[in-house]
Amino acid sequence: MLYLVISTPLPTKPSEVRINRQKLWEWAQPLIDRQIIKDECMYAKVGRGAIALFDVSSHEELNNYISQWLEIIPAEMQIIPLLSQEVTHRFLSDHVT
C-alpha cells in the first residue's frame, strides 16, 4: 500500500526545532534502507516540512510510523493513498474499450 505523506509542522522558530529536524532524518534512514520509505523518497519542503512515500502492508503500520514522526516533529499530516504503477497499468489495460 503506497501513501504520500506530506507534513506541515506546527509554527515555531526554525532554530527551536533544528535538533528535532536532524532526529527526523536519523529516524527515517532505517526506513529508507528497508524500502518502507520507498525509492529513497523523503524530501524537505521549501520553507518547512517534508514529504515521504511510504510502502506499508496496512493502515496500522502507517499509523505507527506517522505517530513516531509526530513524536519527533509535531505537524499536520496530509496522507494521500496512491496506486502503484503496476496496478495503474493493469487497471488501464483492463478498462480499454
Regions found by a protein language model. Name each.
Residues 1-97:
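Conserved, structured core segments of small domains
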